[in-house]
Amino acid sequence: ENFINFKKIFIIMKLIQTPITDDVINDLKVGDKISLSGKMYCGRDAVLPKLSRSIIDGDTDKYPFDFKGMAIMHTAFSVAGIAPTTSNKTEIESSIPTLSSAGVKFHIGKGSLSEKTKEELNKYNSVFIVCPPVAALLTNNVVSKSCVAYKEEGMEAFFELEVRDIPGIVAIAHGESL
């Protein structure tokens, strides 16, 4: 197979399979290196606020997915592939608490988050994972993709990906951060 084996690069990694459970989160600590496989979702500035609004309004039945145990990477999906965008953009960071309250366990991106967001992640037993912004390598580990919400947003629509061995480092967990 043509997948990049990030486990060889990161040496000691915790292998995580979606959906992510509270037991998995409870076992993670800041600085842990992870390798994520299974379903991962992609969204950023355009769709994350819309998803948050749907959660607040109690209007999530229209989606063909469940937020519980979900991993969301802060990225669009384009012909160039996937790579995390800066997670502390207002539209993205402000959506993290609401998405976590609905069951999202991994928020994957880059950059730092506010103290308030760190507290909200802890409240909902969710974590922030930083991921290397290496589009070619990450995209190589996408097995399949499908647009599952907000198709009108084009490459910034909400995509469901099947991924294998997406690397990351736990940057915020249990009220602690790097």
Residue spans for each PLM region:
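Feature captures the catalytic cores and cofactor-binding loops of soluble hydro-lyases/lyases
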Residues: 42-43, 47-166
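Active-site/ligand-binding-proximal alpha/beta "capping" segment
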Residues: 95-97, 169-178
